[in-house]
Amino acid sequence: MNKIHLTLVFLSLIGVVRAQTETAADTSLLQYVDPLVGSGGHGHVGVGANVPGGMVLAGPTLSGTGWDSTSGYHYSCNEIVGFAQMHLSGTGCSDLGDVALMPSMLPLELSREGLASTFSHDSEVARPGYYAVTLDRDLIRVEATATDRVALYRFTYPRGSDDAFVTIDLQNAVGDRLTRSRIFQVDDFTLCGFRHSHGWAADQQLWFCIRFNRPIHNFYSDGPSEPYARATFEVKAGEAVMAKVALSPTGEMGAMLNMRTEMPDWDFRAVRDEAARRWAAELSRIRAELPTRSQMRTFYTALYHTLFAPQLWNDVTGDYRGADGQTRYGAAWNNLTTWSLWDTYRALHPLYTLVMRDRMPDFINTLLSITQEQGELPVWHLTGNEIWCMVGCPAVPVLADLIVKGIVPPRQRASAFSAIAKSLMRDTRGLPYMWSHGYVPADVDEGESVSKSLEYSLAFGAAQQAASALGLKEDSAALQTGAQGYRKLFDADLNYMLPHQKDGSPKPMPDFNPCHQTADYTEGTPWQYAWLVPHDVQGLIGLYPTQQAFITRLDSLFLASAELNADANPDITGLIGQYAHGNEPGHHIPYLYNYVGQPWKTARLVRQIMSTLYTDKPDGLCGNEDVGQMSAWYILSALGLYQVEPAADRLQIGTPSVTRAELNVGEGRTFTIVSRNLTPRNIYVQQVKLNGRPWHEPYILYKDIIAGGTLEFVMGAKSGKMW
């Protein structure tokens, strides 16, 4: 014990400060963020205290266990089972909820049910970097704030006691199974241990250090490997016990060092205020003005939710546990996790390339390191684990986009393209058929062949764009079969993408119904997947006899009956006809009208989606937040922009909802968007000027945005015209 105590003292002398790009913080923007938006309905957002991109999301885990409780929190539930240090936000699957604390006045039964206490939403306070609630059982006030890797709690006890309790629960989390754990007392103030679990992440390994501001009066445990422990404290009425909980992916010593570096003191207000400042700085990357307070709340809460992940998965020293289970030491960059790429390549990552270019080196280094560790780019990474969730090669369009936009530095471009090539050439998940057939045959695959083929096809198309940007003509040509393979799935009679067999014939589908999900589609229907060719929209249009035939077909998507079969995937939500905004495969579809000279239809649909499927209430999202993708769609669309094509040099023009927005695009440059004559009726763009000159294209180039300047819209009620 003395050796460990001396180590703690030694570690307190070490300081490793995470490098950050300072942004002028406008703290007034915090008033527009409500962290409870999206915590009801199907939003699945996590609620608690964190900082942008931090490892910790410290807050309540509720007793609900259904699909809508994947984050550990759903607004319909009023029972807390513990305050855990990590939570997912917006995902369709459950995990995390690790290392939970629960204060009480008396010893509680050591079970999920025994620890639970009801609460009232009236007692909740949720702000960026801060969460508070009062437990009904003992009227204990619980407050939480955080740094990157450390949670800080303040438990205020209403009555005095010689034994005020804090129970540490390593048994229960959110949807996983405990495999190994340890908790032991280091000194009069400190507990350490680890929690290993199997869940969505098959081999999650997390270490922790808990330090209290008061000496532990009694410590109760049936042994270090038992998953529950109790610490008691002497308190007077109204006094607080504070607890720091530091996390590490590498070991207990890493957790201790993270605590000593990030939170050496006990000033709760200072930590809370610094968390708020960091949030304000990130939100200030876009200084937007919208017509109503409700729109301002929706906009800035959406921007807040885009900043949760990817999140840190390393120690302050740079040490981290890689995808191969090996610990790397002293990385000069921040290793990141929570890569929900099938969702986020569509809008979240394009948004990052506009206003968060300074964060991209960590993104690039992490993607390349994961490739070295597991042989390919990540598909869905959580706590350093590849969980293989969703279809396609979704990191390919992300990395290809960074190449095309010149964000990958010259010294890393060869390795970046090599990572793309390795990922597309894997002998798994049907990929070899993309090279030989251009699609994944339905009769040799385990399912979802259409969705897999289309996702692969757009990844091949994105890789082609990266190859072209790097002058790799032979590589670009070699990718052609996969990039154009979508054509082989198109049925010209039905106008759907249909599953095909290895011999090229359509798969027999005697009960085909385009409004119903089948085993050949991922979280969607034939209606919704008929348009998933964002890398070659003109090629998709060319599959129809005429451009007007394409327009008529696109119109019919939004006019069709919204009926779904009873066992439809719950992700198919937010329906306008058969367009499903509550899930990602269709997010680009409203912008396809730009490609056929009818941008006013894009404007009408985008405004309808924004005004009816997003609100500033707990049920304000029509589908899963999906780690920022749903919110990123809103942010870009509110700015009047959207990137349809993966790995593209342009963003499509839609209909701005901002009257003015200033984007910090980096290196001291600002890109300003101004909307004149904007009213609830004036939703159609009449004129566009770029830096004072008339602009007649339905898109704006990425290079013109990051160069800084002004994009001016003149809005009106008249539709049916180009600008």
What is each model feature region?
Residues 1-22:
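Bacterial Sec-dependent N-terminal signal peptides
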Residues 21-397, 401-454, 462, 467-488, ...:
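Accessory carbohydrate-recognition regions in carbohydrate-active enzymes
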Residues 459:
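ATP-dependent phospho-/nucleotidyl transfer catalytic cores
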